[in-house]
Amino acid sequence: MTVEFKPGVRYRMPAVFGPAPGPRQKPDGTLWTPEEAGTMNAAWMTVKYRTHREQLERILPPGFELRGEPDVHASLAFFNDLYWLAGRGYGIVMIEIAATYRGKTETIDGSFCPVLWEGVPDAIMTGREELGFPKLFADIPALDIDHARGTAGGSASWFDFRFFDVALHGLIEVYEEPKLPGPGGAALYYKYMPRTGIFGSGGCDVAYTTTSQPQPGEAGDTSPIKFGGANFRKWKAAGGSVNWHRATFEQLPTTFHVVNGVADLEIVEYLGAELVEFSAPGQAVSANVMRAVEPAL
């Protein structure tokens, strides 16, 4: 008797060993309960800067257009005490752009993320395959936050090559509604999986947008991270900066083109920086609301 794949259960390669545990299901394929998920803790810093419209447009997938000014939100975050990693954590580096996606029947205003890096393969595999997040790998140490001095910073590297730095100074606590920094609107990602073919002749198996936008006709929060029941704090910075360090093939053999593509987005002007810290129910970051959007063509 061969493997039987159960409907309504998530599988990932190697799929023959049964349902795949992760942030969105337990090893038996059922959902985690709030009691099992416990409480997670996170810190998230973002620097916003303006670049050139034509540079941003070059990295927009089919069906996308810029929404508003050509601004980039570069973020560094670290999640701790994650239930699905048995209490472990990891870091994230990402950029977001305010964009509109026009699908076959839907038009969605949101935050498009062209790329994000994460610090553990477990998070990368689950997010790439299940959610369509364009995740890559990096060594991301815990954030360096000093509230007494009002500073925060961090970095990301791979193969001992540091490709990203961020620094904030003059942090002053403010009291605002709990939400992540960024362009606002639903999360938007472009899922692309190549089809196996001789000398790359297969094209792609899938190429479509995924989003946290509720289904048409449904109301609800558009954020993939839910802050119900969260303890949330926020600081505005007097200033912040980022550095994307261009790489060679020898330094980052399979990802230098991505790092350089982000570095090519010229920083014309810094527009603000902020830091948030929150403790929330573990399931808040499961992103179980993500869905596919049917493309126009």
Regions found by a protein language model. Give the residues of each.
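Interaction-surface and assembly-scaffold signal
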Residues: 2-29, 128-297
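N-terminal ordered "arm"
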Residues: 23-78
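Residues at beta-strand starts and edge strands
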Residues: 43, 91-93, 148-150
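Short, structured protein-protein interaction patches enriched in aromatics and acidic/basic residues
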Residues: 66-100
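Small-residue-enriched, tightly packed secondary-structure blocks
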Residues: 84, 110-112
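Extended amphipathic alpha-helical segments with heptad-repeat/coiled-coil character used for oligomerization
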Residues: 89-91, 105-109
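Beta-strand elements of well-folded, non-transmembrane domains
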Residues: 99-103, 160
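Short, solvent-exposed aromatic-acidic interface loops
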Residues: 112-124
